[in-house]
Amino acid sequence: VTSYTLNEVVPLKDVVPEWVRIGFSATTGAEFAAHEVLSWSFHSELGGTSGSQK
C-alpha cells in the first residue's frame, strides 16, 4: 500500500472570491483507486474595523 501526504498553506483571500465552495477531486487515469481525505483543517478570521456592533 502506498500512502501520500499533501500539506499546503494557501492564503485563500489572495486567490478566491469572498464566497466560495471548496472540493476535492482525484484520478489515476484508467485504473480504479480509492481516494480518502483523512484529515481536513480550515481556519478563518473575520476582518473589518474595530468598534461596537449595534
Curated annotation (Swiss-Prot):
Keywords: Lectin. Coiled coil: none annotated. GO terms for molecular function: carbohydrate binding. The keyword DNA damage does not apply. InterPro entries: ConA-like_dom_sf (IPR013320), Lectin_LegA_CS (IPR000985), Legume_lectin_dom (IPR001220). Tetramer of two alpha and two beta chains. Belongs to the leguminous lectin family. This is Lectin alpha chain. It comes from Lathyrus odoratus (Sweet pea).
